[in-house]
Amino acid sequence: MGNAYTCHRLVEEAGARGISLEIIGVHDITVGQSTDPKIYCNGKILSPVDFVINRYKWGKCKDQINRLAKKSYNPLSPFNQYINKYEQLLHLQSRAFLKPRYLLADGFADYPFLSSMLGTKMVAKGLENSMGREIFLIQKEEDLEALQQYGKEKEWLFEEFIETSYGRDVRVYSIRGEVVGCMQRRSEHDFRANVALGAGVTAYEPNDQIRQIAKAVYEQTGLDFTGIDLLFGKDRFYLCEINVMPGLEGIEQATGVNVAGRMMDMICGDF
């Protein structure tokens, strides 16, 4: 966490605006019992603060840290809800985008049934991972059986494969529904277009459809900062997923936009 590009960029831009912003590692946190509801970081009590920027998605300690703040970015309730990829497809609706056909199941699901609903080529996604982890292309029964190593308690989101978007997608960075940066990610060797997996990035000019999508996602989720991943369809974009804590390195390098600065300007405007 402490070495992450995004965290350090936010600290840098906060400092430029006279704001003291500190990186707190969740694994350094201890939460007291109900009779002593203090929160400790490396043994020291954390004091109340004006705001928290959530950059960690797991567990309950981060929820308790949010109790210290007057405001949270992103707000904790939609942050926790929309971490989950199934929740995203279940609730987000807009005429501006299409959604892949999808099913929720474990890795022991019946391949003939899944393929009859989604096509013989499909994508299996873990519900809460990012950066391309737990994303698999399923083309035959053996590919599906490989998911069984994760156990029956592991649920997967199965989606139809959008062939027109093989190895490429568009990442939109939205601040309260306004598009502040947009890039195309492209991989020459993988169906996944994640920067963390080596995909290249170039600036992408947002059109009215993309702006409508960003506005719809904000209005439906209340997420202040959102990375919206779109797949290329024949006529319209498909919603791939949204990211509740999107990284800044790729989008800032591809577009030259000071996204971290725009984020801090928005936060300053709330106080």
Give the residues covered by each predicted segment.
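Short beta-strand-to-turn element immediately C-terminal to the catalytic PLP-Schiff-base lysine
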Residues: H91, A105, F136-Q139, S174-I175, ...
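Protein kinase-like catalytic core scaffold
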Residues: M122, V180-G181, T226, Y238-C240
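Phosphate-binding site of ATP-dependent enzymes
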Residues: R133-Q220
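A short beta-strand motif that forms the metal-chelation/ATP-contact edge
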Residues: V172-S174, R236-G250
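Rossmann-like NAD(P)H-binding beta-loop-alpha module
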Residues: K99-M122
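A long amphipathic alpha-helix within ATP-dependent nucleotide-binding catalytic cores
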Residues: D190-L239, V259-F271
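Conserved N-proximal alpha/beta basic substrate-recognition cap immediately N-terminal to
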Residues: M1-L104
